[in-house]
Amino acid sequence: MKKILTILALTLALAAPALAQNTTQKINKKNLVIKEWNTEPRSGKKVLDHVTTFDADGKKIEEIEYGSEGQKWRKRFEYGADGKCVKEMVYNDRNKLETVKKYEYNEFGRKKTQYNYNAKGKLLTIKVFEYIAEDA
């Protein structure tokens, strides 16, 4: 029994730093910019692939996707007083507005309706979200 307890204590002592490291690796997203890079295998050249920007509250406010020729698209996000995303604007490679998505939420804070508009404000489609929970 003493052997088992000793082995268990040693195992926990060795695993503790790894467990602590996992908990400290959580990223604080406040005022954070995440840049993703691709590296070309032959030349070793780094190419910017994606940039995500968060505001002081940790909310994602912008995403930009890049290709070899530069920016492919850009998305901007706006939030309501409750912290939920209420508007998403998508811009093309020339930073020209292409589409706008507006969101409504249900009483549980889940997306209820998504309205999709073109750049001129014309309603294109409406997406309704349905949540079905089955009891186990």
Regions found by a protein language model. Give the residues of each.
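Buried hydrophobic residues that stabilize the cores of well-folded domains
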Residues: Q21-A136
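Bacterial N-terminal signal peptides
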Residues: I7-A15
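Positively charged n-region of N-terminal signal peptides that target proteins for export
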Residues: M1-I7, Q21
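Sec/Tat signal peptide C-region and signal peptidase I cleavage site
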Residues: A16-A20
